[in-house]
């Protein structure tokens, strides 16, 4: 009983997808869908002038961004709490 319900539901979903794809074929739906799925953001690799939370740092060099401080124990930038 459960298997037949699952197959019926899967068939309806497949029918819906095929119908939608055939209607959208004029708009190049498959190509557009694949390009959106496999799109890679353009990462320029710009470096910041400071290091953010969790970035490795050297204590005493003031490499971390404002509101962060280099932990002398762990050697990474942490949130500076003003102590």
UniProtKB/Swiss-Prot annotation:
Keywords: Amidation, Disulfide bond, Ion channel impairing toxin, Knottin, Neurotoxin, Presynaptic neurotoxin, Secreted, Signal, Toxin, Voltage-gated sodium channel impairing toxin
Keyword Transmembrane helix on entry: no
Disulfide cross-links: 50-65, 57-70, 64-77
Main location, first listed in the record: secreted
Residues excised as propeptide: 22-48
GO molecular-function term, one example from the UniProt record: ion channel inhibitor activity
Extent of the signal sequence: 1-21
Any GO CC annotation of this UniProt entry: host cell presynaptic membrane
Compartments reported by the entry: Secreted
Domain of life from the UniProt record: Eukaryota
Modification sites for Leucine amide: 81
Expression sites by tissue: Expressed by the venom gland.
One Pfam short name: Toxin_12
Coiled coil: none
Its job: Selective antagonist of neuronal tetrodotoxin (TTX)-sensitive voltage-gated sodium channels (IC(50)=1270 nM on Nav1.1/SCN1A, 270 nM on Nav1.2/SCN2A, 491 nM on Nav1.3/SCN3A and 232 nM on Nav1.7/SCN9A). This toxin suppress Nav1.7 current amplitude without significantly altering the activation, inactivation, and repriming kinetics. Short extreme depolarizations partially activate the toxin-bound channel, indicating voltage-dependent inhibition of this toxin. This toxin increases the deactivation of the Nav1.7 current after extreme depolarizations.
Note: Negative results: has no activity on Nav1.4, Nav1.5, Nav1.8 and Nav1.9 sodium and calcium currents.
Subunit and partners: Monomer.
Family in the record: Belongs to the neurotoxin 10 (Hwtx-1) family. 15 (Hntx-3) subfamily.
Domain notes per entry: The presence of a 'disulfide through disulfide knot' structurally defines this protein as a knottin.
Name the UniProt record assigns to this protein: Hainantoxin-III 8
Species name: Cyriopagopus hainanus
């Amino acid at each position: 009983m459960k298997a037949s319900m699952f197959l019926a539901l899967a068939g309806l979903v497949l029918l819906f997808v095929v119908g939608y794809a055939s209607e959208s074929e004029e708009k190049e739906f498959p190509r557009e869908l694949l390009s959106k799925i496999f799109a890679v953001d353009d990462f320029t690799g710009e470096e910041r002038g400071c290091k953010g939370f969790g970035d490795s740092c050297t204590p005493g060099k003031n490499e971390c961004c404002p509101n962060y401080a280099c932990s002398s124990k762990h050697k990474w930038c942490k949130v500076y709490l003003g102590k």
